[in-house]
UniProtKB/Swiss-Prot annotation:
One of its GO terms (biological process) is tricarboxylic acid cycle. The gene is aceA. This is Isocitrate lyase. Divalent metal cations. Mn(2+) or Co(2+) can be used. Disulfide bonds: none annotated. Induction: Activated by RamA and repressed by RamB. It catalyses: D-threo-isocitrate = glyoxylate + succinate. The lineage of its organism: Bacteria, Bacillati, Actinomycetota, Actinomycetes, Mycobacteriales. Belongs to the isocitrate lyase/PEP mutase superfamily. Isocitrate lyase family. Its cofactor is Mg(2+).
């Protein structure tokens, strides 16, 4: 019988946990025997998830003040342009999936209203686009990008339910090829964007269960998925229960009509929660309301006073009015200073949404008033970017693989007379 897909034994799993530096400082509230029992007799290979996780982990654990930064993408082609331009990771936010890329086909606010398998679907779409670009580049002998299939960090939201929902969602993320996932400590049924009001926290222990479930799914799948814990305690004013003694110092005693408890928000509960999450998370993210380096520093120092090697993440959010808070020179060095504090993964959650919407509005505004002049201005900027910065999508037929599939056709039939790119307007007007 073939050994392909053979599951690991409990002894092999335990040895990996005990000897692999990847798991230094990580706590699991389950045993290797339990993981082995859950595997089944055949384990699928998750090449993209494993490879991406390893690349991401290597990037965020490099020595010094370096960091990896990413932009939120909501389409495959946006991710391709990010990698072509030089970024080394892609971020996928639930907000953008809710707004314009979910499987229901509707536009939603960031309140977990869309089908739960939507984010894994977009992860798969982005990976497919990156794989296609890699294939195109390889057939053309284009080595300008050293790694097309970069890690994708995807939004698990509040898990869309309890621990079992988290487990299944994490499995779907891994199958789609996500390198990392993040999970927030809000009540899933009341989930809100981190920059909206009305957020309801869950007890600290309940979120530890979420993180434990996400890790378990990765262990069963045999992938070193990067698990990121997010806390919304800086702004949230409600919590479901007073059952966890770690939350009790922040509970005011007041109740709402729904039965929720009022809590004191701010830096202190964020640090307390982060310390509780640290043994279960590879990275920790505190959602904030402004781009505040001093707040970030206090958070990092508070967490690292007990967990000195804890890696951190930071949302450089479009919900901040950056120029209203910081001068140009402060903005220019913002990410570098965060990196020095230990914020090793930094991302702009809604970059794709803003780029897509403003880009089309700007073109349409000009087109409505100037006709073809507006589009030709765009095309000329594309030509200039192609000449000076390596932009390739001005050759749109080539960008989506017309030449690549021509090569497949001529491999099957060297005498094929029906190839697509040869004789096209693109070949005649753009390939010179």
């Amino acid at each position: 019988m073939s050994n392909v897909g053979k599951p690991r034994t409990a002894q092999e799993i335990q040895q990996d946990w005990d000897t692999n530096p990847r798991w230094n400082g990580i706590t699991r509230d389950y045993t290797a025997d339990q993981v082995a029992d859950l595997q089944g007799s055949v384990i699928e290979e998750h090449t993209l998830a494993r490879r991406g996780s390893e690349i991401l982990w290597d990037a965020v654990t490099q020595e010094g003040d370096g960091y990896i930064n990413a932009l939120g993408a909501l389409t495959g082609n946006q991710a391709v342009q990010q990698v072509r331009a030089g970024l080394k990771a892609v971020y996928l936010s639930g907000w953008q999936v809710a707004g314009d890329a979910n499987l229901s086909g509707h536009t939603y606010p960031d309140q977990s209203l869309y089908p739960a398998n939507s984010v894994p679907s977009v992860v798969r779409r982005i990976n497919n686009a990156l794989l296609r670009s890699d294939e195109i580049a390889r057939t053309e002998g284009d080595t300008s990008v050293d790694n097309w299939v970069v890690p994708i960090v995807a939004d698990g939201e509040a898990g869309f339910g309890g621990a079992l929902n988290v487990y299944e969602l994490q499995k779907a993320m891994i199958a789609a090829g996500a390198a990392g996932t993040h999970w927030e400590d809000q009540l899933a049924s009341e989930k809100k964007c981190g920059h909206l009001g009305g957020k309801v926290l869950i007890p600290t222990q309940q979120h530890i269960r979420t993180l434990n479930s996400a890790r378990l799914a990765a262990d069963v799948a045999n992938t070193p998925t990067v698990v990121i814990a997010r806390t919304d305690a800086e702004a949230a004013t409600l919590i479901t229960s007073d059952v966890d003694e770690r939350d009790q110092p922040f509970i005011t005693g007041e109740r709402t009509a729904e039965g929720y408890y009022h809590v004191k928000n701010g830096l202190e509960p964020c640090i307390a929660r982060a310390k509780s999450y640290a043994p279960y998370a590879d990275m920790i993210w505190m959602e904030t309301g402004t781009p505040d380096l001093e707040l970030a520093k206090k958070f990092a120092e508070g967490v690292r006073s007990e967990f000195p090697d804890q890696l951190l993440s930071y949302n450089c959010s479009p919900s901040f009015n950056w120029s209203a808070h910081l001068e140009a020179d402060e903005i220019a060095k913002f990410q570098k200073e965060l990196g020095a504090m230990g914020f090793k993964f930094q991302f702009i959650t809604l970059a794709g949404f803003h780029s897509l919407n403003y880009g089309m509005f700007d073109l349409a505004y000009g087109y409505a008033r100037e006709g073809m002049t507006s589009f030709v201005d765009l095309q000329n900027r594309e030509f200039k970017a192609a000449e000076e910065r390596g932009f390739t999508a001005v050759k749109h037929q080539r960008e989506v693989g017309a030449g690549y599939f021509d090569q497949i056709a001529t491999t099957v039939d060297p005498n094929s007379s029906t190839t697509a790119l040869k004789g096209s307007t693109e070949e005649g007007q753009f390939h010179n």
